Amino acid sequence: MKPLRVRAAVCVLALGLLTACGGSGQDVVDSSNVPRLRAHAADAVNGRPRTVLPQGPRSVFTTYRTTGDDGTKVLHTKWHGRASGYTGDVWAWVPPQYAQPQYARSGFPVLIALPGAWGYPANYWADAPFALEERLAEWSKQGKTLPFILVMPVLNPRKAYYDGSDIPGQPKMGSWLTKDVPDFVRANFRTYGSRDGWAYMGSSSGGFAALKAVLKEPQRFKAAIVNGPDTAPDSPLWKGHPAEELANDPRHLARQLVARGGPQVYLAFELGSKEDAVPDVKRFISGYTNGARGPIHSTLFEIPDGVHSGHTYIKRMADSLHWISEQMQGPVAAPSV
């Protein structure tokens, strides 16, 4: 799978401008066929979900870029992870609904968005060419997706591949992504206490990390959008550590989850039809997921003529976000007086 990562690295420039993969400026995305979300039956059964108010310490943010005309901004800060010991860059964006009075005491669902290639020193999902924040504001306003808090950390500590894992003798990037980054979110934003409010999205190497995070810790994370992923660990840093490598292999984790019978997780895969990864990812889906039956639920959005690029995946992002939104907890408005 390493050639996929190399190709992605060639395509991704410093700020996520994928000019080498074709196109400039914002991609044209048609979400007209994405329906509105259904009412969440779980809300009526379980009542008001438990909101977790910001725990602190609050981060000091700077504005990375302003998004659209709704007053929202992508913010940037650094966060020191207690679990990993790593200090890294994080970008964050809250949807317009977060500041609306009716949601002032409500939690919001969180989407941890991971880039492809090295995912260092930047995270391209924070940048204007993809306009993920502007699109999510539009889609959630239309009722097609939930209004997620977007959190966009660096994926790796340098220009090397750590497979989103705690590789012995290396920076603990698995702990960074699954413990420290959620701690950052809980320190600064209103969230939910249950896994119904937590999901990942990632592409290529970030897709591997997103897939693995949900399969490894399904009690904490419910869903992932997995774009053109690697489906097996392949960092050269695993050499000499076969047991730890196996413990971070999505195939092994999927088998374990199926054997346990749950908890149920939801994986939305995106693939460009021209990707080299198509056969491998389809084998993973057919071999380790059970479609609608679970405990590993899956769906696949295959993009005609699509290649291994964020410009491909953004085209079906509304569909993927809609699909996982149907399984997750949205904000709850205060009762009308």
Language-model segments: which ranges?
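Non-catalytic cap/lid and distal C-terminal segments of serine-dependent acyl enzymes
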Residues: 2-12, 16-337
